[in-house]
């Protein structure tokens, strides 16, 4: 075999080796020759960039000036670079693109390896974290500022005013309770998220929980003038965590009592709690006949700190985390939360979870 044939064989072996190497990589990866043409690409790269074709210029498939400029610099300098690439079609995605030189036996840069790491989910989670911290800080700062203002007043102008002191201390107590509820909900949400991957398996009777929570909230319903009805006579045993499912029932029933006033102001307020089952699932639904929820609010109800009427929610002791907690609890139970509502026609919140294995059928 002459030298020319040997070099061709070596290049073929190297090409196959590189193709096999990137083929084993889980992230999109391509190899581009010094002429800018595609030499190899793995399956994830073809999925991300369907226009990729071996032997054609990379620019035809990848319309990313920053990445292509980095590729040219790497080919010229032999030093690796990392750039960000944002793709907006068909959906917005963000990639960290690493461009590394591939040297030939002579030491010359004959190609470059591009790997694309998807940062979309990490960036989304980071935005959620920042928003969450900002919202939590705001929710705590408001009552704290109020309490500090009353402390200044009590230490100053109202120092010797017994009537004002009693009034301000009552307000401070309520603001303190509000902060305590918020901290409790934040801690609960954190614990649920930490255990999200662990599915609870204890046999829990949803009917028993519904009756227990309804009995607990009966004084509140009476105070609010709400007729609370429970249809949960037969056991419906799901696989779950009792404390968490009690929390779910408390949130849904208490919300219905507090915010489900009759739309026409007639005073004919009622809340219906129903527990049912299918062959494989158990459900607890809470129906009110209040003002209902406008369609634009429905997709955002389970967002943390989202409120339809922030003033009303805070005045009734809401933290803005109740439905977020319900959603995460049901996700841990491999179940779901569904909401149906029409303005002026009330709302129904229902949670569904798989039956315990001993009660299926």
Indicate residue ranges for each PLM-predicted region:
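Conserved catalytic submotifs in the C-terminal HATPase_c
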Residues: 202-203, 222, 227-236
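Conserved micro-motifs of the catalytic ATP-binding
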Residues: 194-199, 237-240
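PAS-family sensory/regulatory modules and their coupling/dimerization elements
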Residues: 57-121
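Short helix N-cap motif at coil->helix boundaries in the Bergerat
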Residues: 206, 292-300
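Sensory modules in modular signal-transduction proteins
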Residues: 7-45
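Short alpha-helical segment of the dimerization/phosphotransfer core of two-component systems
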Residues: 174-179
């Amino acid at each position: 075999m002459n030298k020319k044939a040997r070099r061709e064989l070596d290049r073929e072996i190297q090409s196959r080796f590189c193709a096999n190497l990137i083929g084993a990589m889980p992230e999109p990866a391509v190899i581009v020759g010094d002429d800018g043409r595609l030499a190899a690409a793995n399956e994830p790269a073809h999925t991300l960039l369907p226009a990729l074709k071996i032997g054609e210029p990379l620019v035809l498939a990848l319309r990313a000036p920053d990445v292509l400029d980095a590729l040219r610099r790497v080919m010229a300098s032999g030093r690796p670079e990392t750039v960000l690439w944002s793709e907006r079609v068909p959906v917005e995605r963000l990639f960290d693109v690493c461009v590394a030189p591939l040297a030939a036996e002579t030491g010359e840069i004959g190609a470059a390896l591009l790997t694309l790491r998807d940062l979309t989910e990490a960036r989304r989670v980071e935005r959620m974290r920042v928003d969450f911290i900002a919202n939590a800080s705001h929710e705590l700062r408001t009552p704290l500022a109020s309490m500090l203002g009353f402390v200044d007043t009590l230490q100053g102008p109202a120092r010797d005013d017994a009537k004002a002191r009693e009034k301000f201390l009552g307000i401070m107590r309520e603001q303190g309770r509000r902060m305590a509820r918020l901290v409790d909900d934040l801690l609960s949400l954190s614990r649920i998220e930490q255990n999200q991957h662990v599915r609870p398996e204890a046999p829990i009777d949803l009917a028993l929980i519904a009756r227990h929570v309804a009995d607990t909230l009966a004084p509140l319903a009476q105070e609010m003038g709400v007729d609370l009805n429970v249809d949960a006579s037969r056991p419906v045993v799901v696989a779950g965590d009792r404390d968490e499912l009690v929390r779910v029932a408390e949130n849904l029933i208490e919300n219905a009592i507090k915010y489900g006033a009759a739309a026409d102001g007639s005073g004919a307020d009622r809340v219906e709690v129903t527990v049912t089952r299918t062959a494989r699932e158990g459900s607890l639904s809470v129906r009110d006949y209040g003002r209902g929820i406008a369609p634009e609010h429905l997709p955002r109800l389970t967002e943390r700190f989202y409120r339809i009427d922030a003033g009303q929610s805070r005045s009734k002791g809401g933290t803005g985390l109740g439905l977020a907690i319900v959603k995460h609890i049901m996700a841990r139970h491999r179940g779901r939360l569904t909401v149906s509502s029409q303005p002026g026609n009330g709302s129904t919140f229902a949670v569904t979870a798989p039956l315990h294995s001993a009660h299926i059928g």
